[in-house]
């Protein structure tokens, strides 16, 4: 239909202009039976005088393990989301690759134990208790 072709044209234009950065499939790795560990890492860094946080953020973003890098306000400078297959793999990444970077002053690693909602999608199937409750 004409309306559908207009939507595709708008999507193509938005991709060409860099407005749409990409598409992503959200996978429930637990349901898929795949070992996948996620961690949120808080970093305090020493920014460069001429480039601020951009240089160290770009260096960190280049690591394959890094899913996201965010400049934060508050108690720390950068927030990272890291993915790996085991807790040890992430711990080794922090110890061997992240912490040794000259501009990294400190790290605090928080392992994700369970995901309930991510990017607007619920991950847990709600169990509904359909028994009636009588209050006496």
Where are these regions (language model features)?
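N-terminal low-complexity segments that are often proline-rich with Ser/Thr-Pro
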Residues: 1-2
């Amino acid at each position: 239909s004409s309306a559908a072709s207009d939507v595709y044209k708008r999507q193509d234009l938005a991709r060409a202009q860099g407005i749409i950065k990409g598409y992503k499939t959200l996978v429930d790795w637990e349901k898929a039976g795949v070992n996948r560990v996620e961690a949120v890492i808080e970093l305090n860094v020493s920014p460069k005088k001429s480039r601020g946080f951009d240089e160290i953020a770009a260096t960190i973003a280049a690591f394959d393990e890094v899913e996201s890098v965010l400049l934060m306000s508050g108690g720390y400078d950068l927030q990272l989301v890291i993915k790996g297959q085991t807790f040890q793999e992430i711990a080794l990444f922090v110890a061997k690759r992240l912490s040794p970077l000259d501009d990294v002053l400190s790290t605090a690693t928080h392992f994700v134990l369970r995901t309930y909602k991510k990017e607007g999608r619920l991950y847990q199937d709600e169990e509904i208790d359909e028994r009636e409750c009588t209050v006496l």
